[in-house]
């Protein structure tokens, strides 16, 4: 089983992935591919340099390049109980993964209102997160420009994540339970 987790920043993708990891899934993150390529190229890694690097990578090799590279990793990691892919950033990526990994592929969209995501971002205080509403809106604009929201229409499951962390964990466990029942 391969579960692709998508959503806007602070929608709960990483927390959802943690639940899957606790249930034996191997979690792979799209951003890790970009970070490794940047490291190999000797490029310093921060949010802005990652955006610039990934944008130039997509222009040079196609919008689905990160997905194609991820597909190779997934094929190498097939021994796991399941695989969770976190952080799809556009329609070409989800379509490429569906095509390349046709068996047992499930796309999950984390649905969370912008005001809730902004509050979460302020609370988590990651080094590369914007620290004000203006910065948050700029980041939203960049994500939308990449087509992150377009991934939603390809979701097999939409999980509303506007409650507590415990609520999200319950939703994740319920989904895993349903998948195990249908397997």
Give, region by region, the residue ranges found by the protein language model.
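Extreme N-terminal starter segment of soluble prokaryotic enzymes
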Residues: 1-3
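Conserved phosphate-donor/acceptor-positioning beta-strand/loop module used by diverse small-molecule
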Residues: 86-87, 100-125
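Short, well-ordered beta-strand core segments
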Residues: 27, 107, 157-160
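Walker A/P-loop
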Residues: 14
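Small-molecule kinase domains that catalyze NTP-dependent phosphoryl transfer to phosphate-bearing small molecules
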Residues: 64-65, 123-178
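ATP-dependent small-molecule kinase phosphotransfer cores
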Residues: 26-99, 134-138
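ATP-binding Walker
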Residues: 11
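P-loop (Walker A) phosphate-binding loop of NTP-binding proteins
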Residues: 8, 20
């Amino acid at each position: 089983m391969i579960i692709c987790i998508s959503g806007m920043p602070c929608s709960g993708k990483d927390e959802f992935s943690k639940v899957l990891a606790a249930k034996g899934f191997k979690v792979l993150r799209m951003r890790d591919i970009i970070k490794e390529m940047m490291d190999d190229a000797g490029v310093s890694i921060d949010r802005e340099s990652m955006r610039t690097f990934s944008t130039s990578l997509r222009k040079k090799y196609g919008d689905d390049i990160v997905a194609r590279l991820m597909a190779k990793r997934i094929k190498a990691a097939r021994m796991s109980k399941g695989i969770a892919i976190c952080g799809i950033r556009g329609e070409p990526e989800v379509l490429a993964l569906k095509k390349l990994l046709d068996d047992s592929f499930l796309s999950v969209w984390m649905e969370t209102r912008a005001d809730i995501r902004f509050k979460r971002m302020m609370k988590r205080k990651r080094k590369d997160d914007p620290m004000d509403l203006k910065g948050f809106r700029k980041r939203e604009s960049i994500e939308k420009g990449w087509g992150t929201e377009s991934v939603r229409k390809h979701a097999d499951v939409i999980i509303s994540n506007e409650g507590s962390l415990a609520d999200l964990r319950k939703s994740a466990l319920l989904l895993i339970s349903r998948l195990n029942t249908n397997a």
